[in-house]
């Protein structure tokens, strides 16, 4: 399933959707076609449709564009992949990975997995639980709300997953892609995509920067 990235969080409200949307915007800034797929039932797209004035219903069935991000509900995923897609990447947001109805089998059927985690007192045990879960053995980890001075300690805590660990920059607006266009806040997402390439989740085998031409 090349080009398909599945994102899940260790618990609710950990920042999973923000990471997914920011990753879409980062890939767009790199010249790739990317879309966000809501694979959970939190009705985020519905909320955006009723909140943002620039929400556009596309002629393509199921497609909603909000602040330049193409978004689809989970029902459209089979159609997006059955006959091929013009998107280079599909970012699939599975939400909380520890809810009772979480689709473990579906989550692993992809090019790469990303787990969004945290280190606050109410988050660290959920993070450790995810690390012990064999379902997420091949996943990369993105930590939200971690200060720069604490990142080294977190990498040490991650041990053999340190290479697959990244830290989400401050992003109060998940639809704000301006930092990427300025070349800012890119480290986290370059680390994620380097992992995607290593695990075979990239459609053409590489992530090119502007300097690569």
Regions found by a protein language model. Name each.
Residues 3-14, 22-25, 29, 33-100, ...:
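P-loop/Walker-type NTP enzyme "switch/lid" segment
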Residues 43-47, 122-124, 147-155:
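Short, charged/polar "capping" segments at the starts of alpha-helices
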Residues 47-58, 129-132, 151-162:
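Short, aromatic/basic amphipathic alpha-helical patches
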């Amino acid at each position: 399933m090349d080009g398909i990235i599945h994102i899940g969080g260790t618990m609710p409200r950990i920042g999973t959707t923000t990471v997914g949307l920011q990753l879409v915007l980062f890939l767009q800034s790199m010249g790739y076609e990317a879309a966000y797929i809501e694979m959970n039932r939190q009705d985020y797209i519905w909320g955006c449709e009723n909140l943002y004035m620039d929400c556009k219903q596309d002629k393509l069935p199921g497609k909603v564009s909000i602040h330049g991000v193409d978004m689809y509900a989970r029902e459209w995923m089979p159609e997006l992949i059955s006959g091929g897609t013009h998107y280079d990447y599909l970012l699939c947001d599975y939400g909380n990975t520890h809810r009772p109805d979480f689709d473990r089998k579906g989550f692993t059927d992809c090019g790469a997995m990303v787990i969004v985690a945290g280190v606050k007192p109410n988050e660290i045990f959920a993070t450790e639980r995810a690390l012990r879960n064999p379902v997420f053995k091949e996943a990369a980890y993105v930590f939200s709300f971690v200060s720069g001075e604490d990142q080294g300690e977190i990498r040490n805590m991650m041990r053999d997953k340190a290479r697959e660990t990244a830290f989400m920059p401050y992003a109060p607006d998940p639809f704000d892609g301006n930092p990427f266009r300025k070349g800012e806040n890119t480290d986290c997402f370059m680390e994620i995509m380097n992992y995607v390439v290593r695990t075979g989740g990239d459609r053409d085998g590489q992530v090119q920067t502007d300097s690569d031409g």
